[in-house]
Amino acid sequence: MVSTRGVLYYLLRPKELRPILQWKALHGLGHQRDEKNESPDVKACYQYLALTSRSFAAVCQQLDRELLMPICIFYLILRGLDTIEDDMTLSKEVKEPLLRNFYTTIYDQTWTFNDSGTDEKDRELLVHFDCVAREFHKIKDEYKIIITDITKQMGNGMADFVVSGDLTGIQKIKDYELYCHYVAGVVGDGLTRLFVEANVADPSLLKNPRLIESMGQFLQQTNIIRDVREDHDEVRHFWPKEVWSKYAQDFDHLVSPKPQDRKKALQCSSEMVLMALNRADDCLNYMAGVREQTVFNFVAIPQSMAIATLELCFQNPAIFDKNIKITKGATCQLMIDSTQDLQHVCQAFRRYARRIKKKNHPEDPHFHDINAACNKIDRFIDDRYPNLQDEQAKADTMYLAVLVLGVFGVVAAIL
């Protein structure tokens, strides 16, 4: 039930309320579960999917039946890996073999793990992992091969970082991108192989690994930028020292509330945003190769959320104080845009790229590079949709006209 405060918030922000109502009316277009005929293991998998990530669970519901359960299982397996890697109560000696052998563990339909820290968010997933393994056993062999390969790559990559101790402080940009590759880039590779195997994406995508890599890097780098305060509080620093050491002697200075430190911190965050933003046009190019609507929805929603989150983080000192997120209204609007077509997604990317340009200022050492990255997004969209700006201008004019008429109508009714 919505609180009185919530009602007042949306009454004062009608632009926020409209997409929420629209999405609530439309979201039933996704896959509808037949819960009466689901096995206990399937129900458990959906339950843990929702517990680990409500947003990903919602995105998953966009998928067709052919890929719904394989990708659900794929996500839960990788989330299991991530839970082991994240658990600060487990020693390196315990973590390393668990991570490296996880690709074989998923074939054991009785395996469970009860030694996660009591405060670990996704502890229950590992406690009841046998239900995931049993459902993994049922999917097509072609999908199993892909999921096994990606699990092996990710597990070994995570183990390498655990053994080296780099999770408490990544040193070089190349190490930062390598970490993002292992936790997100390989996921993009696995998903693309699943899409091509299911004949819902252009096979030529597999010949362009840069586009696949950018999809994962864009999401992961954005998450790392957004989560900087939360990770710092857990003594985990993913921002590479090669970047932050230009702006501070110690990472503590980046999260300091002192004005002299905060200015440098924002310049540091600009460089982090720039690295992610340079991947954005590749993401649009990748999405152009997705042929089936439900799969397009699945890949487009997270990417649109990422560009919006990147804009929210840019030049925003709040990221050093707390975890921030885009509003519910903005989220619903992005989901509406992302479940239509590439043109609507391009409009969303352009909208947020221009907001980034508007917030950019000449005093920032990355001013010109950030403008260039935003212009690169514009060029991709202009090349693909040369008349899009005219169409957007007409739509904006129509919206303003309706808004003005509505205001006059309300005033007339009051008088």
From Swiss-Prot:
The chain crosses the membrane at residues 395-415. Its cofactor is Mg(2+). Glycans are attached at residue 114. It catalyses: 2 (2E,6E)-farnesyl diphosphate + NADH + H(+) = squalene + 2 diphosphate + NAD(+); 2 (2E,6E)-farnesyl diphosphate + NADPH + H(+) = squalene + 2 diphosphate + NADP(+). PROSITE patterns: SQUALEN_PHYTOEN_SYN_1, SQUALEN_PHYTOEN_SYN_2. GO terms for molecular function: squalene synthase [NAD(P)H] activity. Pathway: Terpene metabolism; lanosterol biosynthesis; lanosterol from farnesyl diphosphate: step 1/3. It is a single-pass membrane protein. Pfam families: SQS_PSY (PF00494). It is found in: Membrane. Belongs to the phytoene/squalene synthase family. Squalene synthase; part of the gene cluster that mediates the biosynthesis of squalestatin S1 (SQS1, also known as zaragozic acid A), a heavily oxidized fungal polyketide that offers potent cholesterol lowering activity by targeting squalene synthase (SS). Catalyzes the condensation of 2 two farnesyl pyrophosphate moieties to form squalene. The presence of a gene encoding a squalene synthase supports the identification of the cluster as being responsible for SQS1 production and suggests a likely mechanism for self-resistance. This is Squalene synthase clz20. It comes from Cochliobolus lunatus (Filamentous fungus). The gene is clz20.
